[in-house]
Amino acid sequence: MNATPQDYRHLDVGPLLGNDSGMNDLLYVNGGNPLSGTITVRGAKNFVSKAMVASLLGETKSVLRNVPQIRDVAVVSGLLSLHGVQVEYSAADGVINLDPSAVESAHVAEIDAHAGSSRIPILFCGPLLHRLGEAFIPDLGGCHIGDRPIDFHLEILRRFGAEVDKREGGIHLRALGRLKGIKMELPYPSVGATEQLLLTAVRAEGITELSNAAIEPEIVDLICVLQKMGAIISVDTDRVIRIEGVDRLTGFTHTALGDRIEAASWASAALATGGDVTIKGAHQVEMMAFLNTFRKVGGQFEVHDQDIRFWHPGGPLRSIVLETDVHPGFMTDWQQPLVVALTQATGLSIVHETVYEKRFGFTCALRKMGANIQIYRECLGGAPCRFGQRNFHHSAVISGPTPLHAADVEVPDLRGGFSYLIAALAANGRSTVRGISLIDRGYEAFQEKLEALGADVSRG
Ligand code: EPZ
């Protein structure tokens, strides 16, 4: 069975095709119930989509396990299918089979229609340049949490020997002969740029060395996939990654690491609602920075082999000073859900966002719901970051505890959207959360999970 939009049964087909209808795109949330029970998180969105792209580099079939049924998987499946990859997905088993033996160029208009709201298309560059000698990458979507330029990506591709031609609607790339290994230092340890380099270097001629690389667990898992395919990659402790290019790669069989962002989101929901949630598929090693912070705020957790239990022990939560950072720091994607829980902590919490310059826009709606949050341009509470001199509102001071009340809110971005669900669950009264199809991008069956945890929610 080919992965078609119909396979993503609980998802709207419209958003998959970049055609939001707005129908039934809201959730009513009757707040006040502590979340309680057990849920499962499957593979990490920010790994699964990249591993799917990596399959393009192999000459044989790949099998990826623990794949969640989320819209980003649907978007990448669509793009791979357009390029001649046979994609078969069983949502129940979470297994995706990818056969790239008949890869071909796709029509520009179709690529555009399937790119949806994702940023993953930019990672098709290296694999397509190796397979076809050219690529067309549509203008990217993704969450509006900063400018999110792709200058590092384009610089990497140019240095490998690709001709990069910006056109209306996207970028056309052409390989001028076989791509050749490079030595490069990233200005910032960008996740996407590191992945771009990995997916390009593995089949380039000679050695590539990247300094100041990102080393997020999802990247390490991608390196494991590439090693299974036949790549030679070493990761040093000082953020240096070395790749020896090889002529051929095969397919892989791999089980995706769990989604630590989804796990932390549910943990924050447990804390904000005074609940007790066990998350199967959450792993300590990838969440250590989150677990430390969760404990400092006053939440409790218990790590088991297959799950982590998170709960609010009763009594007041504590305010904290927090700075987001690249791995092994506190992830930016954990920030938004946790901020909702911090509205319930006693005293002043300070959160300094150092990864994205505009990731506090979501706090407007929280203020509407009764939270006391002020946003500042200065780097508060930590070392100065690269946004300090640039006039961005990237520090927040949260004063609590403040009771939250119901409101009518519109999802601004993926993690901000989940944060609104948490706020609505913690609030008194019935909230309306609009634009929830955006949450489908990264949270598998979130309504079913909410219901399983005792939340009183219904679709509009
Ligand atoms: C990935 O985005 C994730 N997305 C993001 O998750 C995550 O927040 C981010 O990494 C950081 O962990 C996916 O994996 C699909 P970056 P990415 O390149 O790769 C700047 C979520 O909610 N930068 O590490 O796009 C950039 O502007 C999403 O799941 C450049 O300046 O992030 C940002 O400030 C949101 N030029 C910083 O680097 C470039 O060419 C980090 O971005 C590239 C990045």
Can you describe what each PLM-predicted range is?
Residues 2-460:
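Short, structured segments at the rim of ligand-binding sites
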